[in-house]
Amino acid sequence: MRRFLLIAFPYAWLLALFLIPFAIVLKISLSDVALARPPYMPQFSWDEGIGAFLSQLDFENFVFLTTDDLYWKAYLSSLKIAAISTTITLLVGYPIAYAMARAPESWRPTLMMLIILPFWTSFLIRVYAWQGILSQEGYLNQVLLWLGLISTPLTILNTSTAVYIGVVYTYLPFMILPIYAALEKMDGSLIEAAEDLGCSRSSAFWLVTIPLSRPGIVAGCFLVF
């Protein structure tokens, strides 16, 4: 009985927090638009029964989503942002995870804390901080002007560049942590064996380290995408 309760609890949690809200959203998606509160007219009524619901059931809302150009542009734009952001996050996150895995063991908890610590603050505060960094009067433009790399402030806010920066910053730990976990468990003797067999450090990295860390890469890409 105790074992049953231990197994049933997570399923009940899943039912309450995921399946029931999903069923509510599905019900709304099959409803008709109405100028009311809430702004839809449910097709299902307990008084009329399931038969009346099935006789009136249509997927007009879903057909509209697949035929309207506005939604297609939104879908494609979302996929583009997700793909580019995932690629950038991987390129930035892998070297960080590799450096953490190769750092002395006494340093690793501190490095892990530095990765996680910023995300203990409110997301809203971090958004305002990035606005202060990326605005035309922000720190980034001030540094670039001081270095003489630009003559006029760059416009970064309200552009796709700002979107990519925000997405990469937000999801970077979700890329770093799985890759770090995979690299930390890797047997260092495999690298030594590859070098003994004639591989250079770079060749051993591409032929041994990257393949062995592939599960972490895949997990990180799934989490970020």
Which residues does each predicted region cover?
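Membrane-helix interface segments
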Residues: A103-L111, Y139-L140, T159, S189, ...
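Transmembrane alpha-helix signature in integral membrane proteins
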Residues: D69-A99
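Membrane-embedded alpha-helices of multi-pass transport/permease systems
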Residues: L19-L30, L91-P95, L124-Y128, E137, ...
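Membrane-interfacial helix termini and adjacent extracytoplasmic/periplasmic loops
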Residues: P42, G49-L54, V127-V168, S202
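N-terminal signal-anchor/first transmembrane alpha helix
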Residues: M1-I28, A99, P109, M113
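Short loop segments and helix-boundary regions at transmembrane helix junctions
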Residues: R2, I96-S122, R126, Q131-Q136
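Transmembrane alpha-helices
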Residues: F9, M113, L117, Y169, ...
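Short membrane-interfacial helix/loop motifs at transmembrane-helix boundaries
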Residues: L19-D69, E137-G138
